[in-house]
């Protein structure tokens, strides 16, 4: 179900830590991070103008981290719709920092960027996170304990 107002997004309802409070967006740490530094840039209005400004600020943030040598590169992107993996039905931009050597064999793949083996396989079966993760991600089909369909 699409969320109608910014005040109703889970990050606000759960009083999640706000890392940056910009004019058009807020930045929160991702509750299910792919790696350290995985952030969500969330526009305050669901409009093209606010989404565009949020994307622009995400890029500026990443470029600054690269220019200052804090990271080597970054991914950013949006999941639009449940089939694409969206679980919070309000636009938000994922920012995933990257470091040289963080993935063996296939550098650059965001699917392999999970430090400490985090991702669906980790959160979906971890005793501390399993119930909440599966509730928030109902579209993932769990075959049995230990395997994704």
Task: Annotate each language-model stretch with its function.
Residues 1-149:
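HIT superfamily nucleotide-processing domains
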């Amino acid at each position: 179900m699409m969320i109608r107002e910014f005040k109703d997004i889970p990050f606000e309802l759960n009083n999640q830590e706000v890392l940056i409070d910009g004019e058009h967006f807020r930045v929160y740490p991702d509750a299910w991070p792919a790696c350290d530094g995985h952030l969500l840039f969330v526009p305050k209005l669901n409009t093209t103008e606010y989404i565009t400004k949020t994307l622009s600020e995400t890029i500026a943030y990443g470029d600054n981290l690269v220019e200052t040598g804090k990271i080597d590169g970054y991914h950013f992107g949006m999941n639009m719709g449940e089939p694409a993996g969206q679980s919070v039905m309000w636009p938000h931009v994922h920012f995933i920092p990257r470091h040289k050597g963080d993935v063996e064999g296939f550098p650059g793949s965001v699917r392999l960027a999970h430090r400490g083996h985090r991702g669906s396989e980790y959160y979906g079966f971890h005793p501390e996170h399993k119930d909440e993760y599966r509730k928030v991600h109902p579209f993932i089909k769990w075959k049995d304990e230990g395997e994704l369909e």
